[in-house]
Design a protein with these regions (language model features):
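Structural preference for beta-strand elements that scaffold enzyme active sites
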Residues: 2-4, 35, 71-76, 108-112, ...
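Conserved, mostly hydrophobic/aromatic
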Residues: 5, 28, 36, 65, ...
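Active-site beta-loop-alpha junctions enriched in small/polar residues
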Residues: 8-10, 39-41, 77-80, 116-118, ...
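Short, acidic/polar
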Residues: 16-28, 90-101, 192-200, 251-254
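Catalytic domains of carbohydrate-active enzymes, especially glycoside hydrolases
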Residues: 22-41, 107
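Acidic/histidine-rich catalytic cores of soluble enzymes
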Residues: 35-36, 136-248, 290
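Glycine-rich, proline-tolerant flexible connector loops at the mouths of alpha/beta enzymes
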Residues: 37-61, 116-121
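Active-site acidic/histidine proton-transfer and metal-coordination neighborhood
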Residues: 59-71, 82-182, 191, 202
């Protein structure tokens, strides 16, 4: 396994305007990461960039990564593959396919897209099982297109709907395409109140990319320490992002499970805490390297 980092880990500095995604590359290399992945590309922190602007930015990022001696290992975007109508679904599939072109321009071997964010469409509760056939059909169309560009696609346990290990496993088999796999985020299972080690043991065989993430867990009814940035799980417990090894996610065990399943690719730290990100990433990579050997 090789240590990598998500550009989202630098979001404190990107949001404040101190750096852009471009400058995150040199920072990641300086800290000691061997790979970096990018979330939705925003040239010069521009949120509404056109596809052509993103493609041009992707080329610049690829050259900068080459200069810094660091690999671009994945590209991550949001997506909703169940919009409630054929027309809306088709438009979203087209948009995601355009983002596959960005991944290819980056030189990223994998691209992660979300699949859904909500189980209520209009005034109707839909539910995951009812959405699954449509989501799988759309994800299959995307991965078939991505295969022509040499990019593997994957979905992550993310978004609180398609987040449990049994759901993402069912999604994997419903898509049923050799170019499609899972991005296994060991921390995100806690967002659905699932034990991370058990969840990872279920989905490890399907992993084509991995996020390493740690959270402090705060049970429902307990107050979070002052100054700690938290968010609610599906069952209304609280989580707070932290450096790898400072929380309650069994990171070392999850990595061991993945290794036993044959995973030997990049493992990307995705830091979501409130402490200064550079300090936490330096601490995190030292611990991660010790865990992966």
């Amino acid at each position: 396994m090789k240590p990598s980092v998500s550009s989202y880990s630098f979001q404190q500095l990107i949001s404040s305007g101190e750096i852009t995604q471009f400058e995150a590359i040199a920072l990641a290399a300086e800290i000691g990461f061997e790979g970096i992945e990018f979330t939705d590309l925003r040239p010069n922190n521009k949120k509404d960039a056109t596809l052509e602007e993103q493609l041009e930015f992707a080329r610049a990022l690829r050259e900068e990564a080459k200069r810094c001696g660091i690999a671009i290992v994945s590209y991550t975007i949001g997506a909703d593959l169940y919009k409630g109508s054929d027309e809306a679904d088709a438009a979203e599939v087209k948009r995601v396919m355009d983002q596959v072109k960005v991944a290819a321009e980056l030189g990223a071997p994998t691209m992660r897209h979300d699949v859904c964010y909500k189980a209520v469409i209009g005034d109707r509760t839909v539910g995951f099982d009812r959405m699954l056939p449509t989501i799988a059909k759309n994800a299959r169309a995307i991965t078939e297109f991505a295969a022509t560009l040499g990019v593997r696609t994957c979905s992550e346990n993310h978004g609180k709907i398609a987040q449990d290990s049994d759901r993402v496993e069912r999604l994997y088999y419903a898509v049923d395409h050799e170019n499609y796999g899972l991005l296994v985020d060991m921390g995100n299972f806690a967002c659905a109140d699932e034990d991370s080690a058990l969840a990872v043991s279920r989905v490890a065989p399907y992993a084509i990319h991995v996020h390493v993430k740690d959270f402090v867990k705060i049970p429902f009814g307990k107050e979070a320490p002052e100054g700690l940035k938290t968010f609610s799980t599906r069952a209304q417990n609280l989580l707070a992002g932290c450096a790898i090894g400072d929380g309650d996610i069994p990171v070392a065990q999850c990595l061991a499970i993945l290794k036993a399943a044959g995973y030997d690719g990049y493992v990307s730290i995705e830091f979501e805490g409130s402490k200064p990100c550079l300090d936490e990433l330096r601490l995190g990579i030292s611990r991660l390297k010790a865990m992966i050997g």
